[in-house]
Amino acid sequence: MADIDQYILDDSDIAFEYELQKSPSVEVWQRYIAHWEAQVCEDGVRSARHILWLYERMVTQFPTLTVWEQYIGWFRRQYKLDQYLDTFKLYERCINSVKGPLGVFAVEVMLFCISTFDLDIIMKGLQLVLHRCNKDEVERIWNIVLGFALEHVLPSEEGPNNIDFSAFNDRNYEDLRLDIYKLLFLGGDQTEIEDDEEDEDVDKWTASLLRYYLQVANEDKYDETLRLLIRTKDIKIIKECFDLYIFNDKTGKNNRESKKEYDFDLYIYYLDTLDKLRLDKDYKSVFDNLLEKYPQHRVLLTLKLADFHMKRADFDKMEKVLTKALSETVKTNEFIAIYTYHVNFEQAYVETIFDEMRDDPEIQVQKKWKSEMDDHLIILGDLTSRYHLLVNDLKIRQNPNSVSNWLERTTLFEDFDKKCEVFVEAIKTIDPIKVKDKEYGMLGKLWCDYAKVYWSNKSYEEARTIYESATKVPFPDLQDLEIVWHTWAVNEFQIHNIERALKILRKALTVPPSYESIIDRFKSENRRLPSQTILFTSKRLWNYYIDLLESIPTIDANDVIRAYDTLMTLKLITPVGILNYATFLKQNNNLHGSLQVYEKGINMFPPEICYELWTLLLDEVMEPAHQATKERIRELFEQCLQQLGNTDININSIYVKYSDFEIHNKLFSRAIDLLMSGARRPYTNKEQLKQRVDLWESAISKCEEFLGPDSLRQLLSECIQELPNSKAITYVLKFTKLEMSLSDYTRARELLQYGAQLLPPIKNEELWGLWEQFELEHGDKSYYKEMLLLKQKLEKEMKVDTEEVSKGQGNVQFVASSVKNQEAKTNPDEIEIDI
């Protein structure tokens, strides 16, 4: 009763107690508690201890979740986090006394536990509520706890992701030397050193939490959870969970077959875990399994295995692993990674022993270390000296049909026998059909280089055997076969065996019957036929054959002629070949044949080449030595103009040459008519207009030189009407000066008036200057005034460019000298061109 006396202080308390005895209920308890809480606030008669006493009695009598929530809520408001352990005990008592599911109350419990930041409380709370919740609440609770662990507990660095082999070469070189030093001179297992260094960073609490979570998590959460688990660095729990959830090893029988495929980096971390736990047998089992399942990651696994052997000071096995990997990898970046790793290790190994021998006299006298250093110096030297050969090995593995790689390989050996071995290996390996387009010609060169090895050694018969074999290789492209035959012939010529060289070329260039159908078939088959079928079309061999024939003073000229004729029949001759053939015939006094070569060759080439050949032919035929008739020469000129007249080629020189020929024959009018016929041709662009202007200029110049003023007047009249205004103005001035020189001032004034209307005054200053000077010398005041009035009028009216007007309406009317005020014809081809 002493305890009751501490709390029951007045009649109202007794009344509540009596009511609770008579008809106990939660409502009575709540009114009782509210009554005492009021006393705590009003007069301080009561304390929190009194309220606590009532709540304890209420939850004992009515242990429902609602009552407990009211009690815990009051307690937390009263004490906040100062007494969080007592609060947790209340939660614990509540859960143990309440029956049935907790519902959202379980979430409240976990939120409270999280707010304490007490890892033991959080774990106990989690274990307390999980079995009393439904699926949705369990998921929510785990999200809360895992979120807390991720934000506040788990180390911030990320787990493995996109693991690649670059990490091995990113290792600090001095750290590598330190590791080697510990292995060589301190003894022990490198994994022990790593374990000591990592113990401080292990997050055992999160590891235990995640292990607990994996027991209830769906399989689709395994990957994410295992990655979080890796960040805890608790390798024992990591191995345990990987065994259970990746390898499904619940029997303890070391089953290493994963039921579901996970990202490769997870398996790699598991491999690292086995390494750190020194489970070497398991490590090798998993390694072999991964090597079989992930061949695309062979290099990373190889470096892992090399590192594994290094940590156990098993350097011989490490060397074998790296050497084998260097000879098998087919990717450049992988080769670089393995090579760099190997070289760095060997260098660090040698330097570590060297430094220790230098600093420690006891080690200096031990032969073991000197021998170790020498052995690894040899390995290091071999790696560096054979670098280019190793790289070439890699290239050939990447593409055994790459001829350039084999050619490069032949340069890496100086020894005769080894060089020949490379050529033989290359010839056996390369499939001519699989040689890429960009390497056409290289395979033929490789055969020739092989033969050259013997030829340079004066083993001519062996070299000829190689050349003979090369001519039978089914090269898909003609370049390769050309190189073989050409090089063989050149070599024979260089040792003065000219007859053999000619025999080789004649054999290669034998033209088969129905050669046209053979060529067509080769083209249609798209290189599926061997190039031997069209060897006779090789321009390179034909040109060399002809050069060789022409270089022999005693050769029969008919042999050369037959070669040239065959070349023309096959349509393989070049413009230079035409020139050479014509020159050869001319030197052999066959002038008629020389001209015929030009005439035949002209039709074999595009207009640009035709023009050059026509020029040569016309120059040649006009030489006195040919004694060609004038009619024959004119016939050739006409053929030339007819063939080239409708092309875009500038043939002004042909017109001028033809005109000069007629002048030489005293046919001046015909010479000028020829130039005018070229000038009258229609034009469509600036360049063609310039060409026509040049011909008009040439015609006017020759007319002025060889014909009289009347002819010149007629020519200038037509020129002015044919050309656009901007070009015609020059000839208006020329015409004006002609009339002035003949004292026909009226006609000169009419020409000036006409020319003034062709262009705006601002663009026609030369004409206006000439007109003003003309009126001052030959006119009077009225004519001068008319000139000024016309100029003012034109300055106002000619706002639009007269060039534009002339396009649609022709030039300004031109008054011919023979008939006054005659309307000039329009020029429909006139366009505005200002050059």
Swiss-Prot record:
> Keyword set for this entry?
mRNA processing, mRNA splicing, Nucleus, Repeat, Spliceosome
Which GO CC annotations does the UniProt entry carry? Answer: cytosol; Prp19 complex; U2-type catalytic step 1 spliceosome; U2-type catalytic step 2 spliceosome; U2-type post-mRNA release spliceosomal complex; U2-type prespliceosome
Record SUPFAM superfamilies: TPR-like
Q: What is its main location?
A: nucleus
Highest taxon in the source lineage: Eukaryota
The record's similarity note reads: Belongs to the crooked-neck family.
By what name is this protein known?
Answer: Pre-mRNA-splicing factor SYF1
Species in which this protein is naturally found: Candida glabrata (strain ATCC 2001 / BCRC 20586 / JCM 3761 / NBRC 0622 / NRRL Y-65 / CBS 138) (Yeast)
